[in-house]
Design a protein with these regions (language model features):
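Predominantly flavin-linked oxidoreductase catalytic cores and closely associated redox partners
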Residues: 1-85
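Electropositive phosphate-/nucleotide-binding environments in soluble metabolic enzymes
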Residues: 3, 33, 63, 125, ...
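Charged, low-complexity, helix/coiled-coil-prone segments
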Residues: 4-19, 71-86, 100-107, 137-141, ...
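Tryptophan-centric aromatic hotspots in well-structured domains and transmembrane helices
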Residues: 10, 36-38, 52, 98, ...
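Low-complexity, flexible helical/coil segments
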Residues: 12-23, 46-47, 84-90, 145-151, ...
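Short hydrophobic/aromatic-rich motifs at helix boundaries and adjacent loops
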Residues: 41-43, 110-114, 170-171
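FAD/FMN-dependent oxidoreductases across multiple families
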Residues: 57-141, 147, 153-158, 165
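C-terminal helical "tail/cap" subdomain of flavin- and related membrane-associated enzymes
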Residues: 140-263
Length: 263
């Protein structure tokens, strides 16, 4: 992606301390100094654990991937505590440059749905939701085309507008996920109720229709920019790093080396 470069390192583990009670099956996501991490529990007691980081942080690695993953997770004391008795079941794997978006979504005789058109950083686990909705909207376009309906052009434009709206809405939040201003707002207990409901609505996938939550989300963005400017030096530093990462292409990741090129 030209706007958001990311790299990920992940593995499966056993022995990771799980949450208890009603939270037992919940996914954990936590901010780190150099990105964020996930913990996804499986029914058999194992867990997927990984980190998403800036490409330049991955380039700085001087240890094997397994050790690099564990060292990065230690940036969060609560996560490190849950990993104390963890045992890897698979070698750590690295992936980079996984966010992308095509320039065109449809054309004469074709349209792209799901990952065929775009893949965004899975901060909010939005991939399946975006794919299913684009598939449903795309089916209406195909139906109109096969019937020779005069609505074909209108439905095709509607398909593109809705899918791009959903991706753009998620992307705005994803691109700012590691910004200090965003983190302060996202976890603030002092958010107005309407803005909090709007954020929860977004996380639930309400990103396509003309929802009544769109104005509160707009207010969230306004407040974000105000908070950004109040601490502009730190926020600008993080923003510059993100932009620099979007220009770095990691071409190969081995156990001890990272090869890269800059656009």
């Amino acid at each position: 992606s030209k706007k958001h470069g990311s790299a990920a390192v992940f593995s499966h583990f056993e022995g990771v301390t799980r949450l208890t009670g009603l939270d037992e099956g919940n996914i954990t996501a936590a901010w780190l100094d150099d990105g964020w991490c996930w913990m996804i529990p499986f029914k058999d007691g194992t867990m997927s654990v990984g980190v998403v980081c800036h490409p330049d942080y991955l380039k700085s690695r001087r240890t094997p991937l397994d050790q690099f993953l564990l060292d990065t997770l230690r940036q969060s004391p609560p996560i490190a505590a849950r990993m104390e008795r963890a045992r890897p079941l698979t070698p750590a794997y690295a992936a980079a440059n996984f966010s992308y978006r095509r320039d065109t979504m449809s054309g004469d005789g074709y349209l792209m749905i799901g990952d065929a058109f775009a893949f965004i950083d899975p901060v909010f686990s939005s991939g399946v939701h975006l794919a299913l909705n684009s598939g449903s909207l795309g089916a209406e376009v195909v139906d109109a085309f096969l019937r020779g309906s005069p609505e074909y052009a209108v439905r095709r434009k509607h398909f593109e507008r809705m899918v791009r709206r959903g991706i753009d809405t998620f992307s705005w939040f994803i691109h700012r996920f590691n910004q200090p201003a965003f983190q302060a707002l996202f976890v603030s207990p002092k958010r107005p109720a309407k803005i909090e409901r709007a954020v929860l609505s977004l996380l639930a996938g309400d990103v396509f229709a003309q929802s009544k939550m769109r104005f509160p989300l707009f207010l969230f963005k306004v407040v974000y920019y105000v908070v950004f400017m109040l601490n502009w030096k730190e926020n600008w530093s993080v923003a510059r790093r993100r932009k620099r990462g979007s220009r770095t292409t990691v071409t190969e990741v081995t156990d001890y080396a990272v090869k890269s090129a800059s656009a």
